[in-house]
């Protein structure tokens, strides 16, 4: 850890407090985040945890060194929704081939979309279908320890059996008792369950569905429940490579540092992950810190297809900024729109609900244009080290306070501190070197234009606006437009001050 690095503090859902982060092993900092179920295009709500935990990944690498951080984000490629989509989209194909087409194409689209949003690739992205052995072994251990049982070719976990043992209590993460959870839950009260709160670890596959050899002596083919997948994959990627796993009796080696996801996953998914992992591995905790990002709304309403406001990441990249027009290379255009979406999301603290609006996206794009314009004017180069990003790092070390970090970037821009601006943007994943150095970026085209003269005209127009001389202000705007220069007015979201940018139009 750099001597100058501030203390990283993170809000822990498990304890409901902001805690100083102390890794189990500073040379092997480990984080697991629940990833996509690959059956459909990812929506902008799915983008939020990807961006939030990418910022944390970057911060951990900055503090502890890139080679000392492992970030695992899973891919769920076994699910009823995948089966339904495969049957709908590829009815003429053999079912397993149809499923493979759905998962491969959807995952490829997800990877392209989140890359356009400025995210690094996680260290590992385990797929559920690649870890069936670990799932079966973990389920067998849970049955052996008496917290899971076999019924009608299903294997179920018993929270009440867990609570009868020494160790963590079921419901500690959600802070609800079994009775409270049962009262508020819509659970499948199947006849083979011993108790209503029991949940599925493994279930038999129906005819034609994908299936694998079952655990616990079950002879029919089956497939895993949702929750066991993440317990097994986190064990495979964050415990076993570092000496932990089912063969290890050391509790410290059988837990990792951070587990993240959306607030909607606290119960039942994360609660059930904890139950499975702690009972199988003999630990008090699965992860030391649990982090959850807040919900997302669109223009003040819950996002839903029925309201007509369901927005995918691809929608934002393709159509979110129509003023960009067509570029020669639309993958580059996607990256610019993705950076604007990233900045828009990071203006809300990750634990707070976020209101996605077209106006904020456009304002974020304009602000990025100003920042990159300064970096281009000053010949900023891609930094090898982030030695001037201390203000942004300090803000992010306070429970990922991205709003304070953006305020630091705005201050750096205001005083033209190019190193602090560029390196701070890099730490937040907002710096794409291409947009700094490339000469043919459409939004930075300034052919045969005197930038200083335009700046003087803009200043003159601002004086007229302040004097409420609207006619003269409009005259300058119209004259510039006739010369091929379009002015764009907006407000600084922090200060409320008018900001005027310009672009060359045909």
Curated annotation (Swiss-Prot):
Query: Which EC class heads this enzyme's classification?
Result: ligase
**Primary localisation category:** cytoplasm
Enumerate the GO terms in the molecular function aspect.
ATP binding; cysteine-tRNA ligase activity; zinc ion binding
Location(s) in or outside the cell? Cytoplasm
Which residues does Zn(2+) bind? 34, 230, 269, 273
**What are the binding positions for ATP in this chain?**
305
Query: What cofactor does this one take?
Result: Zn(2+)
In chain numbering, motif 'KMSKS' region lies across 302-306
Annotated TM spans: none
Keywords, in A-Z order: Aminoacyl-tRNA synthetase, ATP-binding, Cytoplasm, Ligase, Metal-binding, Nucleotide-binding, Protein biosynthesis, Zinc
Enzyme Commission (EC) number: 6.1.1.16
The reactions it catalyses are: tRNA(Cys) + L-cysteine + ATP = L-cysteinyl-tRNA(Cys) + AMP + diphosphate
InterPro entries reported for this sequence: Cys-tRNA-ligase, Cys-tRNA/MSH_ligase, Rossmann-like_a/b/a_fold, tRNA-synt_1_cat_dom, tRNAsynth_Ia_anticodon-bd
Q: Which SUPFAM superfamilies would you find in this protein's record?
A: Anticodon-binding domain of a subclass of class I aminoacyl-tRNA synthetases (SSF47323), Nucleotidylyl transferase (SSF52374)
User: What is said about its interaction partners and assembly?
Assistant: Monomer.
> What name does the UniProt record give this protein?
Cysteine--tRNA ligase
Where does this protein come from, organism-wise?
Brucella ovis (strain ATCC 25840 / 63/290 / NCTC 10512)
């Amino acid at each position: 850890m750099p001597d100058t690095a501030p203390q990283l503090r993170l809000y822990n859902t498990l304890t409901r407090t902001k805690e100083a982060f102390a890794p189990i092993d500073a040379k092997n900092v480990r984080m697991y985040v629940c990833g996509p179920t690959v059956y459909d295009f990812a929506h902008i709500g799915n983008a939020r945890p990807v961006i939030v935990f990418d910022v944390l990944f970057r911060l951990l690498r900055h503090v502890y060194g890139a080679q000392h951080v492992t970030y695992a984000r899973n891919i769920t490629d076994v699910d009823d929704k995948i089966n339904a989509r495969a049957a709908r989209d590829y009815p003429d194909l053999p079912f397993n081939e149809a499923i493979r087409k759905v998962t491969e194409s959807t995952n490829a689209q997800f990877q392209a979309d989140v890359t356009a949003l400025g995210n690094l690739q996680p260290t590992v992205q385990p797929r559920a279908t690649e870890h069936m052995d670990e799932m079966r072994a973990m389920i067998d251990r849970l049955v052996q320890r008496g917290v899971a049982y076999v019924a009608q070719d299903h294997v179920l976990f018993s929270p009440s059996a867990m609570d009868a043992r020494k160790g963590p209590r079921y419901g500690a993460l959600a802070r609800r008792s079994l009775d409270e959870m049962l009262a508020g839950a819509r659970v499948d009260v199947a006849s083979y369950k011993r108790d209503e709160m029991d949940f599925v670890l493994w279930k038999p596959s129906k005819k034609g569905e994908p299936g694998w050899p079952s655990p616990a002596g079950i002879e029919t083919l089956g497939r895993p429940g949702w929750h066991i997948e993440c317990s097994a994959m986190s064990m495979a990627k964050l415990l076993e490579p570092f000496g932990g796993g089912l063969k290890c009796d050391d509790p410290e080696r059988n837990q990792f540092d951070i587990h993240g996801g959306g607030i909607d996953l606290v119960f039942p998914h994360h609660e059930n992950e904890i139950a499975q992992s702690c009972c199988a591995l003999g630990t008090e905790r699965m992860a030391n810190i649990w982090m959850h990002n807040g919900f997302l709304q669109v223009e003040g309403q819950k996002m839903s297809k029925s309201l007509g406001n369901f927005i995918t990441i691809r929608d934002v990249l393709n159509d979110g900024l129509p003023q960009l027009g067509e570029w020669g290379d639309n993958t580059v255009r996607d990256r610019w729109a993705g950076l604007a979406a990233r900045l828009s999301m990071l203006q809300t603290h990750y634990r707070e609900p976020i209101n996605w609006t077209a106006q904020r996206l456009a304002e974020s794009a304009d602000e990025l244009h100003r920042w990159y314009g300064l970096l281009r004017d000053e010949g900023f180069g891609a930094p090898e080290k982030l030695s001037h990003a201390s203000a942004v790092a300090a803000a992010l070390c306070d429970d990922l306070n991205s709003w304070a970090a953006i305020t630091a970037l705005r201050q750096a821009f205001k005083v033209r501190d190019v190193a602090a601006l560029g390196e701070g943007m890099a730490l937040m994943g907002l710096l794409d070197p291409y947009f700094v150095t490339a000469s043919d970026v459409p939004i930075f085209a300034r052919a045969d234009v005197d930038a200083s003269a335009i700046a003087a005209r803009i200043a003159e127009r601002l004086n007229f606006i302040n004097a409420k001389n609207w006619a003269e202000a409009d005259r300058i705007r119209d004259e510039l437009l006739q010369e091929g220069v379009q002015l764009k007015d907006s407000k600084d979201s922090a200060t409320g001050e008018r900001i005027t940018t310009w672009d060359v139009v045909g």
